[in-house]
């Protein structure tokens, strides 16, 4: 590690990036930008220099520099820093993909026809092999019918619609997944589409590239390979990949003509935390960061607690008390702001259990393609309840009839122009809407807590809101279907089974889930706090609460043997649960700006302690047992 340096160590990186972004001789690059490296500052600095150097030329040729961000917040921040300059097209990945394809209606129709026909064929093959008359069979036939209905509407669509930040449930709407898949397919298979992209955007920069959809990243790599007059710049860090649909090992095995600049400084974390995350990372790729020379030492403590304790909240409060004593920072305990200490969990299962919506969460998390949408709140079936039903019921409970009217008028198909035309008087539509709202609200009479399935069926009957595709099959079931007994074979549709389980939970779970993903709770995860930083962090490691097969702190800390699946993955070079867990541990620890407390609940205290010391992650003095805590 470098020992003699100053805080200007990374200044040369901006010059390297600017050299790559030369319109006359463009080069592609992967910028390694680790935790707190000042990546956004570098990005903005380089873009401002590009504007000074090439702004007039780009404007004259009607070209732009495209910047793809991961979140809306990051997008807004960069736009603000660039003072809304039209030279730059800053957008999220979904917005960018939609802008690429939105005008190619005929091509989109062809893609949808091919995809829908393929899906119908697959379902019909499954139906031919399955047992007739079961609930699975009835549901599958409805899925086939719904897909055929969508096929039949394609010819009537003159223009497709898509909202990157909302729900896409109209007949002419594309889903988030479809927009990404279509744009990637067009880039890979249509040379004209590639040409249009690079003519419009001679420079394309991707922030948080390790978490950007891998199919689109792969397509962009193909475009760059075939078009050397195009600069593709990726900003990221493979150790910070937290979503499963990001490209693995991005930044390694790059083409020989790619540049690989690296930012070494960590401007965020105190020196002790930087040392810790370097040690955690050492067995992954060995990349190390350097703390700022003017950073304080900071504090790190590791609390090892037996898993069978039954008072975890009290223990964690005692840990905060101990951290206040160790650090001399009373904000660990004496703060009117409950978020003064950010509690970060391994993953959402832990927070879901602690907040009381684990049955809702666990049922949907089983389905791999649902996970990302569940983690960020964008899953259409979930948004149906959080964005339509929840605001409506809250407004009704508060007696805010104006808000009720606004929600219904904006979101109900009853107020679509084509529906209003079917009625002689608009008052008839209003009466129907009021009846539907009152019928829905009646489910909460006497302070009842209705099941999600009852809410879904009520809305499906009244047609107050459009039912998302993922819930249509269930909403279309009749009373006759409810008595059909399904078989116990593997013929069951996992997505419908997951929703059946989720819909059996109560509306209270939706409220708690929404509070969590809206950051209205004290809990956060590596996913939910992406890009954020906190003065005081309490990290909770608990495999029992996590319930996840994707991660295991017990394995990482040597308290549990590696599974056969892990061993098999190691042999073929695939990612293991230990590697995933190491990444998440790294991501959580690097959030701390002043002090970090880690509590590990384990079935083998000695093994965890020995691994922590042997790996040089913590010193003996930094490891504290249960008996040193003043538990109240």
Regions found by a protein language model. Name each.
Residues 1-632:
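The feature marks helicase ATPase cores and/or their adjacent C-terminal helical subdomains
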């Amino acid at each position: 590690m470098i020992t003699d340096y100053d805080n200007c160590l990374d200044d040369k990186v901006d010059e390297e990036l600017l050299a790559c972004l030369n319109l006359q001789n463009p080069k592609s690059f992967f910028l390694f930008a680790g935790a707190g490296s000042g990546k956004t500052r570098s990005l903005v600095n380089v873009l401002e220099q590009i504007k000074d150097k090439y702004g007039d030329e780009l404007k004259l040729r009607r070209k732009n520099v495209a910047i793809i961000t991961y979140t809306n917040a990051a997008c807004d921040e960069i736009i603000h820093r660039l003072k809304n300059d039209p030279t730059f097209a800053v957008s999220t990945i979904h917005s960018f993909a939609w802008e690429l394809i939105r005008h190619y209606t005929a091509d989109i129709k062809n893609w949808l026809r091919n995809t829908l026909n393929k899906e119908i064929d697959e379902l019909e093959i499954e139906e031919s092999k399955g047992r007739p008359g079961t609930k699975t069979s009835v549901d599958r036939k409805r899925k086939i019918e719904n897909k055929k209905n969508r096929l039949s509407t394609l010819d009537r669509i003159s223009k497709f619609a898509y909202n990157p930040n909302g729900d896409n449930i109209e007949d002419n709407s594309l889903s988030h997944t479809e927009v990404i898949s279509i744009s990637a397919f067009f880039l890979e298979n249509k040379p004209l589409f590639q040409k249009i992209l690079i003519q419009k955007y001679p420079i394309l920069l991707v922030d948080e590239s390790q978490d950007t959809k891998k199919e689109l990243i792969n397509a962009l790599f193909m475009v760059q390979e075939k078009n050397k007059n195009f600069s593709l710049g990726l900003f990221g860090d493979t150790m910070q990949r937290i979503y499963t649909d990001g490209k693995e090992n991005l930044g390694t095995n790059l083409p020989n003509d790619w540049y690989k600049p690296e930012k070494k400084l960590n401007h965020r974390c105190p020196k002790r935390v930087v040392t810790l995350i370097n040690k955690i990372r050492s067995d992954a790729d060995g990349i190390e960061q350097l703390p700022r020379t003017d950073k304080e030492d900071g504090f790190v403590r590791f609390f090892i607690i037996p898993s069978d304790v039954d008072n975890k909240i009290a223990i964690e409060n005692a840990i905060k008390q101990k951290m206040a004593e160790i650090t001399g920072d009373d904000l660990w305990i004496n703060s009117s702001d409950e978020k003064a200490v950010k509690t970060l969990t391994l993953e959402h299962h832990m927070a879901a259990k602690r907040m009381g919506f684990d049955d809702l969460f666990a049922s949907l998390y089983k389905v791999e393609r649902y996970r990302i949408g569940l983690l960020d709140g964008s899953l259409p079936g979930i948004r149906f309840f959080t964005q339509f039903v929840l605001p409506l019921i809250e407004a009704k409970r508060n007696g805010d009839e104006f808000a009720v009217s606004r929600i219904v008028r904006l979101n109900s198909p009853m107020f679509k122009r084509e529906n209003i035309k079917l009625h002689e008087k608009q008052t008839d539509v209003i009466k129907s809407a009021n009846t539907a709202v009152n019928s829905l609200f009646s489910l909460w009479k006497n302070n009842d807590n209705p099941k999600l399935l009852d809410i879904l069926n009520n809305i499906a009957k009244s047609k107050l809101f459009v039912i998302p595709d993922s819930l249509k099959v269930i909403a279309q079931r009749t009373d006759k279907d409810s008595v059909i007994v399904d078989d116990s074979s593997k013929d069951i549709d996992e997505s419908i089974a997951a929703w059946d389980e989720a819909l059996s939970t109560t509306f209270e779970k939706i409220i708690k889930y929404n509070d969590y993903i809206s950051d209205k709770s004290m809990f956060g995860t590596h996913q939910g706090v992406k890009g954020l930083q906190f003065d005081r962090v309490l990290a909770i490691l608990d495999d029992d609460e996590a319930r996840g097969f994707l991660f295991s702190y017990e394995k990482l800390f040597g308290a549990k043997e590696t599974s056969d699946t892990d061993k098999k993955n190691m042999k073929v070079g695939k990612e293991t649960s230990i590697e995933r867990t190491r990444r998440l541990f790294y991501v959580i620890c690097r959030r701390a700006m002043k002090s970090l407390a880690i509590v590990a609940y384990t079935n083998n205290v000695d093994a965890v302690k020995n691994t922590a010391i042997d790996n040089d992650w913590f010193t003996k003095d930094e490891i504290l047992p249960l008996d040193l805590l003043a538990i109240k």
